[in-house]
């Protein structure tokens, strides 16, 4: 019997390989992205303390768009997370794409965060 490939399991394996190489510090924390079918989430994490410094998602009250699962929503989340990071004094981050391909919503979030002032 032919088994179907579980795309999320493959993504999790890919993310584990990426996480072996990427580590966020207090000087340069990790910008982690999680994407679901309906929403997109971004966190800036200090891995030395295992704590989230800043987060933003399409579930936030400040979000303000009707649709939450498209490229425009991802751009808005990228701008929000960058604005909140700059308020906390964070300018440089390490981008963690979460095992997702750098395309579509993930790329839109990253580009919007760069345009808003984050460096990676």
Curated annotation (Swiss-Prot):
The keyword Metal-binding does not apply. One of its GO terms (biological process) is translation. It holds the Pfam family Ribosomal_L18p. The keyword Ribonucleoprotein applies. InterPro entries: Ribosomal_uL18_bac-type, Ribosomal_uL18_bac/euk. One of its GO terms (cellular component) is cytosolic large ribosomal subunit. Keywords: Ribonucleoprotein, Ribosomal protein, RNA-binding, rRNA-binding. Coiled coil: none annotated. GO terms for molecular function: 5S rRNA binding; structural constituent of ribosome. This is one of the proteins that bind and probably mediate the attachment of the 5S RNA into the large ribosomal subunit, where it forms part of the central protuberance. Part of the 50S ribosomal subunit; part of the 5S rRNA/L5/L18/L25 subcomplex. Contacts the 5S and 23S rRNAs. Belongs to the universal ribosomal protein uL18 family. This is Large ribosomal subunit protein uL18. It comes from Geobacillus kaustophilus (strain HTA426). The gene is rplR.
